[in-house]
């Protein structure tokens, strides 16, 4: 369905291939979801984090599919469904019909649930106009704390603010995922790409928040030395071919990966700044 606002948002992207078009539609839809959440006041009690946050607000040069949110304080009675109408209304303004459903985690396989806490609710946003596109939203209602946030501006579909984790805390979440995530019996290359981005941009790692994540997710009282050991072990033993294959569909320039090797990432680990 043609819509001036939606089409204008899409026009900022390279739509040459079907994969590029799919990635662009994903990202425009993600921004529409953020606009809906802002309209209902969601960011008064929650913050955006993860790879999609890094992509939208900090220019990460890869596309990202899922959307991760953390409450600012633990609240096991938090009801995300009250934000559904605002998300639906945001899409209706650009001529799109969406459906939002809470997923039953009892139906998750071991792989899907391996990195998902009991206190994380999962929702799927599906689209009538793009049947193949489904955006998964995760909301951690009992999150690891000791993180900082900031307000970040988006101008489309209209001007609004999104509360986001600061970069050092985004980095902490990514490093926890890189070291501990078990994902389809292989590594998630997107974690590695993001790790490279943080080091290249000289972002310090908030170890206090990282330690909080390790304690809550893994019941580990981690020290900096032990974490470095775990990181080096993961980086030096992973199958780099699998790492590259996972991230390729989300890349604008695949040649960026030519230099990737186990040694390359081990050297990156030595460049991580701790705060």
Q: What do the PLM-derived regions correspond to, one by one?
A:
Residues 49-52:
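Glycine-rich beta-strand-to-loop/alpha-helix junction loops that act as flexible
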Residues 1-31, 36-46, 57, 72-275:
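Structured mid-to-C-terminal alpha-helical surface segments
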Residues 55-63:
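Short glycine-biased active-site loop of nucleotidyltransferases that positions the nucleotide triphosphate
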């Amino acid at each position: 369905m043609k819509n001036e606002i939606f089409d204008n948002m899409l026009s900022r992207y390279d739509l040459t291939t079907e994969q590029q078009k799919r990635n662009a539609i994903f990202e425009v839809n993600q921004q529409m979801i953020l606009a809906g959440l802002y309209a209902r006041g969601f960011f008064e009690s929650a913050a955006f984090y993860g790879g999609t946050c890094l992509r939208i607000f900090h220019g990460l040069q890869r596309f990202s599919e899922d959307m991760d949110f953390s409450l600012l304080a633990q609240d096991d009675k938090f009801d995300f469904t009250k934000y559904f109408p605002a998300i639906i209304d945001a899409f209706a303004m650009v001529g799109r019909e969406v459906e939002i459903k809470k997923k039953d985690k009892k139906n998750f396989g071991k792989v899907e649930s391996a990195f998902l806490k009991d206190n994380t609710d999962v929702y799927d946003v599906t689209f009538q106009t793009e049947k193949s596109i489904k955006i998964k939203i995760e909301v951690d209602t009992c999150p690891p704390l000791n993180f900082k946030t900031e307000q970040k501006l988006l101008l489309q579909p209209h001007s609004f603010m999104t509360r986001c984790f600061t970069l050092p805390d985004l980095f902490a979440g990514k490093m926890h995922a890189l070291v501990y995530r078990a994902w389809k019996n292989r590594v998630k290359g997107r974690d590695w790409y993001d790790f490279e981005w943080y080091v290249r941009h000289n972002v310090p790692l908030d170890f206090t928040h990282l330690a909080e994540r390790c304690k809550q997710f893994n019941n580990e009282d981690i020290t900096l030395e032990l974490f470095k050991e775990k990181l080096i072990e993961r980086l030096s033993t992973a199958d780099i071919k699998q790492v590259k294959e996972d991230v390729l569909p989300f890349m604008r320039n695949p040649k960026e990966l030519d230099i990737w090797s186990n040694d390359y990432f081990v050297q990156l680990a030595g460049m991580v700044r701790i705060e």
